[in-house]
């Protein structure tokens, strides 16, 4: 699978999120570049499970310099399977995970008319945001990895981050004019 062929933003205000983990799973899969496949990274051995579909935005390299792409959670019912979800970001959870900056985009499916009214994370029922926050607050407790939170940002605040992370990806991995 050549992930470099999947654009991070097919059009303004839309992200491609490559789903690695369906909602309800306790198994954390990550795309392994060497295997060119999804591989089991670890099992969440606490009582938590992923509340919504989870994956990453291709051709991005986050600014924490850990080599990981930007993360995205897509509120999709029912859960899907690994593949590309065209999604509209409605917010971004700002956090530090294990000492590294680690933003999480919160998205809704771009092609689901049930979410046309949702323009920001604040348009969701408060319980949904609490559920997502609680998942990220506790999912690494038994791994003894601390997490810190700095709150939610609206969708407009997150999109410049995507552009920065695309540039960082090309600068890190391609060493050509794309990163300028």
Curated annotation (Swiss-Prot):
Keywords: Cytoplasm, Hydrolase, Magnesium, Metal-binding
Required cofactor(s): Mg(2+)
Residues where Mg(2+) 2 binds: 71
Localization (cell): Cytoplasm
Binding residues for substrate: 28, 42, 54, 139
Annotated GO biological process: phosphate-containing compound metabolic process
Catalysed conversion reaction: diphosphate + H2O = 2 phosphate + H(+)
Protein name, UniProt field: Inorganic pyrophosphatase
Protein species of origin: Pseudanabaena sp. (strain PCC 6903)
Gene: ppa
């Amino acid at each position: 699978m050549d992930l470099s062929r999947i654009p991070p933003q097919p059009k303004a205000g839309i992200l491609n999120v490559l789903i690695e983990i369906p909602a309800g799973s306790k198994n954390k899969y990550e795309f392994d570049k060497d295997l060119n496949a999804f591989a089991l990274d670890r099992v969440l051995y606490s009582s938590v499970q992923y509340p919504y579909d989870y994956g990453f935005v291709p051709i991005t390299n986050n600014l924490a310099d850990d080599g990981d792409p930007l993360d995205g959670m897509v509120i999709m019912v029912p859960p899907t399977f690994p593949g590309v979800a065209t999604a509209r970001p409605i917010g971004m959870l700002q956090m530090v995970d294990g000492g590294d900056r680690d933003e999480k985009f919160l998205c809704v499916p771009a092609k689901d008319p049930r979410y046309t009214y949702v323009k920001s994370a604040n348009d969701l029922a408060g319980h949904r945001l609490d559920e997502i926050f609680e998942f990220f607050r506790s999912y690494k407790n038994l791994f003894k990895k601390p997490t810190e939170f700095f709150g939610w940002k609206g969708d407009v605040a997150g999109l410049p981050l995507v552009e920065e992370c695309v540039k960082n990806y090309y600068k890190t991995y391609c060493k050509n004019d794309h990163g300028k």
